């Protein structure tokens, strides 16, 4: 039988090597490239009737007083623009007609170029396909709520797993081990986006937060499947040694985890290649998170649980503090 648990230090080393580049990137400003949801600003999209390049659009926006604008192509002659906040409503003076808003000025100026705009059905139009603005106050609130959501989700997961495995000795360790794997996955995703932001200008937006929360759920679900099989093998009393129980459980669930994840990854890849640009950030988070979540649920969560149960963590802590090693008796499973 394949012995996985004896190689757990190699799995830890592999995870460490995966995490380090992202951690280094996060230490170099800018850590992440935030979208307008977190920095305030305006985003709008439009479709030109004639062939147009991003450099031409950038020049038009620069002439309109927005040299900081970032332009992305979302399709043939289709563009997504992100710039500083543009007023979206007209100003009504005490006397006379309403003054044009910032949006009206930019929209009308761009619509006069390159054959004008086309709507989603391909008909001529004078309006943007999409337009949205986020103020500085709203962007701060979104960032704060996103951080709170991740923290509450982690706490709720720990409590739920601890309660679900309450009949198993040291049930809190199961919950903490799942959170360790979860943090491993989140750190890899955030680190990857930090690197992608520096190289390819990939931004972090609300779709990123949605994807991270989805990855959190997927990672914990996979870990629970492995933990549940460990609990079953422990309860049957057929395996007297805890490392053997963990190893046997991993071999039983590994095929199921890999097959489920591969099916999901193929679906994500299809959407990433054929889907729209608006959800590309979400799909990229899911692609990275599902891949790392499959690995961590098998090789991090269960291995960390075994390391803790075997007393390796207290021994390591004593070694760091310079204390003499304390003998820890072997962990034996209780008879049913």
Task: Please identify what each model-predicted range represents.
Residues 1-336:
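A structural signal for conserved, well-ordered secondary-structure elements
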């Amino acid at each position: 039988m394949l012995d996985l648990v004896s190689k757990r230090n190699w799995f830890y080393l592999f995870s460490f090597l995966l995490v380090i580049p992202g951690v280094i990137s996060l230490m170099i400003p800018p850590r992440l490239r935030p979208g307008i949801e977190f920095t305030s600003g305006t985003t709008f999209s439009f479709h030109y009737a004639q062939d147009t390049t991003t450099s031409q659009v950038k020049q038009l926006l620069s002439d309109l007083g927005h040299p900081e604008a970032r332009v992305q192509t979302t399709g043939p002659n289709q563009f997504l623009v992100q710039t500083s906040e543009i007023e979206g409503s007209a100003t009504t003076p005490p006397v006379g007609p309403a003054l044009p808003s910032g949006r009206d000025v930019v929209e009308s100026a761009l619509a006069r170029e390159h054959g004008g705009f086309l709507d989603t059905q391909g008909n001529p139009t004078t309006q943007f396909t999409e337009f949205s603005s986020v103020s500085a106050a709203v962007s701060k609130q979104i960032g704060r709520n996103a951080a709170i959501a991740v923290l509450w989700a982690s706490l709720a997961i720990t409590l739920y797993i601890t309660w679900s495995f309450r009949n198993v000795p040291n049930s809190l360790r199961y919950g903490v081990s799942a959170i360790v794997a979860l943090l491993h996955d989140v750190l890899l995703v955030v680190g990857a986006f930090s690197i992608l932001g520096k190289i390819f200008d990939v931004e972090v937006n609300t779709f990123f937060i949605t994807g991270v929360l989805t990855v959190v759920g997927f990672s914990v679900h996979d870990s629970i499947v492995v933990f549940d099989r460990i609990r079953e093998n422990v309860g049957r009393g057929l395996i007297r040694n805890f490392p053997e129980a963990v190893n046997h459980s991993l071999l039983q669930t590994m095929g199921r985890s890999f097959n489920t994840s591969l099916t999901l990854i193929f679906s994500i890849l299809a959407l990433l290649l054929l889907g729209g640009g608006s959800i590309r950030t979400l799909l990229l988070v899911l692609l990275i998170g599902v891949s790392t979540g499959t690995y961590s649920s098998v090789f991090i969560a269960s291995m960390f649980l075994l390391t803790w149960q075997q007393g390796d963590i207290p021994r390591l802590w004593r070694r760091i503090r310079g204390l003499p090693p304390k003998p820890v008796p072997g962990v034996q499973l209780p008879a049913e």
